[in-house]
């Protein structure tokens, strides 16, 4: 049975469920093989490495969220996107072209990560955390079944905990999901949650 999870501004994401309400295990496995997490993302980025099935972003915010979870049609296309590293050519307004650095990682559901729960720095909880800011969206709320999701002003959340830290300290002070320290600096707006 197909169920539409509606969000503000007409956003809807579809998921399949068994009649008992359990998620289709085949879809979860495919999702893990074809989902990318892209950080430091500009709205003007248009480079494409493979056919995209869906992009999950929060719409109409009057500011860049700087990250998105992207479903690519085939695992090979996902591998190609990762293989090219973190630099991609982006078409920007006024037809100018420039090199733009983004952070491309394979998305990993939190229950597939073997690390114990920890705080992720400013902006909420890190891996395994459960804090979600008011008005947040994410897997389990709108995107169907991966926990609480991204916090409103933080990467940390209960769903795909890619970075586990918030916007507030720059582009992230944790990177717990990938073993990085430090971050890019960049967006420094307000963060809510842990200190």
From Swiss-Prot:
SUPFAM superfamilies documented for this protein: RNA-binding domain, RBD
Keyword Phosphoprotein: yes
Highest taxon of source: Eukaryota
Entry annotated with the keyword Phosphoprotein: yes
PTM comment text: Extensively phosphorylated on tyrosine residues.
GO-annotated molecular function: RNA binding
Phosphoserine modified-residue sites: 173
Biased composition annotated in UniProt, kind: Basic and acidic residues: 12-23
Record-linked InterPro entries: Nucleotide-bd_a/b_plait_sf, RBD_domain_sf
Segments forming domain RRM: 32-48
Keyword list, A-Z: Cytoplasm, Methylation, Nucleus, Phosphoprotein, Ribonucleoprotein, RNA-binding
Region (Disordered): 1-23
Localization of this protein: Cytoplasm; Nucleus
GO CC terms of this entry: cytoplasm; nucleus; ribonucleoprotein complex
Functional note: May regulate mRNA translation and stability. It binds to poly(A) and poly(U) regions of RNA. This binding is inhibited when the protein is phosphorylated.
Record protein name field: Heterogeneous nuclear ribonucleoprotein A/B
Organism: Artemia salina (Brine shrimp)
Phylogenetic classification of the source organism: Eukaryota, Metazoa, Ecdysozoa, Arthropoda, Crustacea
């Amino acid at each position: 049975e197909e169920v539409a999870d509606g969000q503000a501004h007409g956003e809807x994401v579809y998921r399949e469920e068994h009649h008992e309400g359990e998620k289709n295990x085949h879809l979860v496995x495919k999702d893990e093989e074809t989902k990318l997490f892209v950080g430091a993302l500009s709205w003007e980025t248009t480079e494409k490495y493979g056919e995209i099935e869906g992009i999950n972003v929060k719409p109409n915010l009057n500011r860049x969220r700087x990250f998105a979870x992207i479903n690519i049609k085939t695992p090979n296309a996902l591998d190609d996107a990762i293989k090219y590293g973190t630099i991609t050519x982006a078409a920007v307004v006024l037809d100018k072209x420039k090199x733009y650095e983004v952070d491309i990682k394979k998305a990993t559901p939190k229950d597939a990560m073997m690390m114990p729960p920890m705080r992720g720095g400013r902006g909420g909880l890190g891996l395994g955390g459960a804090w979600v800011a008011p008005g947040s969206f994410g897997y389990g709320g709108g995107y169907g079944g991966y926990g609480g999701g991204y916090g409103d002003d933080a990467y940390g959340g209960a769903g795909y905990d890619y970075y586990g830290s918030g916007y507030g300290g720059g582009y992230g002070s944790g990177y717990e999901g990938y073993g990085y320290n430090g971050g890019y600096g960049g967006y420094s707006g307000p963060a809510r949650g842990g200190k």
